[in-house]
């Protein structure tokens, strides 16, 4: 996996109670311990409640079907082993990489996000 690559998460419960897979995007190169920063994309439902600091359109990635946001509250560090094993076991589903311009927009918004921990922000250099 590499910076800009994407995959679908394991099924997760949505606020409506149904289970859906969310698009995850790797936004860093691997660090010395082979860990990546991974963000989650979700449909924009409530502009006044959700963090709209990084809105994505259908044209930004072929998996996105509706106006969506990068949900920085769900940003996490994932190891290369965790991602590779998830893909091998069919838990994670690889998708197309994001375009460079979209990736840069996500990274810039992540650097400013109040929802991302200092630990994770240090990896965004």
Task: Please give the residue ranges for each predicted region.
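Beta-hairpin (beta-strand-turn-beta-strand) motif
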Residues: 12, 41, 75-77
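Loop/turn positions that initiate beta-strands
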Residues: 4-5
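C-terminal terminal-subdomain/extension
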Residues: 60-125
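Compact nucleic-acid interaction/catalytic patches
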Residues: 15-62
């Amino acid at each position: 996996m590499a910076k800009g690559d994407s995959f679908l998460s394991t099924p997760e419960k949505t606020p409506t109670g149904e289970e859906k897979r969310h698009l995850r995007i790797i936004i860093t190169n691997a660090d010395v311990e082979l860990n990546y920063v991974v963000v989650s994309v979700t449909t924009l439902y409530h502009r006044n409640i959700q963090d709209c600091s990084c809105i994505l359109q259908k044209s930004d990635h072929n998996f996105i079907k509706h106006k969506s946001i990068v949900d920085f509250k769900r940003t996490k560090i994932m190891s290369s082993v965790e991602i590779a094993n998830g893909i091998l076991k069919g838990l994670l589903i690889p998708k197309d990489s994001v375009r460079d311009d979209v990736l840069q927009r996500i990274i810039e918004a992540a650097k400013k996000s109040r929802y991302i921990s200092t630990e994770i922000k240090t990896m965004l250099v």
